[in-house]
From Swiss-Prot:
Pfam family, one: Pribosyltran
Cysteines engaged in disulfide bonds, as pairs: none
Recorded family membership: Belongs to the purine/pyrimidine phosphoribosyltransferase family.
Pathway(s): Purine metabolism; AMP biosynthesis via salvage pathway; AMP from adenine: step 1/1
Taxonomic classification: Bacteria, Bacillati, Bacillota, Bacilli, Lactobacillales
The name this protein goes by in its record: Adenine phosphoribosyltransferase
Cellular component annotations (GO), alphabetically ordered: cytoplasm
Any one GO MF annotation of this record: adenine phosphoribosyltransferase activity
Record InterPro entries: Ade_phspho_trans (IPR005764), PRibTrfase_dom (IPR000836), PRTase-like (IPR029057), UPRTase/APRTase (IPR050054)
GO biological process: adenine salvage; AMP salvage; purine ribonucleoside salvage
UniProt source species: Streptococcus agalactiae serotype V (strain ATCC BAA-611 / 2603 V/R)
Self-association and partners: Homodimer.
Length: 172
């Protein structure tokens, strides 16, 4: 199945000069959505994964069905102030400054093998901060899976050394 046909490209959104890659059409089509989830599940199948971690919000949309299919748990990564219990945090650079991500301090047990699942790999800032938190908790990042990679934004370089699966590539 050619999943590229299920990604909408919106020019000059959210700002001038940016092309936003919208996964909504993929999610709206049951066959395409389930195909994408199955592709990530298949990637994870031989990695002995204990936990899926997904950054908000679209990482939830992709990561939760993967966790369900594998019969394992899901741990959310959120912006500050969104999780009710004790958290750890990691800062990351965005094109216009610093931002912070958090996850529950007990989300990952030492030695757990984790697959990070998100919709998009661009600069790699979000996934790099997520890796930092998982490893701080003693988890092992067994891989990273994305629906879309934006080529030319050096996201792969930010996570060099980590096994990565991407279903679609688009210009960045």
């Amino acid at each position: 199945m050619d999943l590229n046909n299920y990604i909408a490209s919106i020019e000059n959104y959210p700002q001038e000069g940016i092309t936003f890659r919208d996964i909504s059409p993929l999610m709206a089509d049951g066959k395409a959505y389930s195909y994408a989830v199955r592709e990530i599940v298949q990637y994870a199948a031989d990695k002995d994964i204990d936990m899926i971690v997904g950054p908000e919000a679209r990482g939830f949309i992709v990561g939760c069905p993967v966790a369900y299919a594998l019969g394992i748990g899901f741990a959310p990564v959120r912006k500050p102030g969104k999780l009710p219990r004790e958290v750890i945090s990691a800062d990351y650079e965005k094109e216009y400054g610093l931002d912070t991500l958090t996850m529950h301090a007990d989300a990952i047990k030492p030695g757990q093998r984790v697959l990070i699942v998100d919709d998009l790999l661009a600069t790699g800032g979000t996934v790099k901060a997520t890796i930092e938190m998982i490893e701080k908790l003693g988890g092992v990042v067994a891989g990273c899976a994305f629906l879309v990679e934006l080529d030319g934004l050096n996201g792969r370089k930010a996570i060099e050394g980590y096994d990565t699966k991407v279903l679609m590539n688009f210009p960045g």
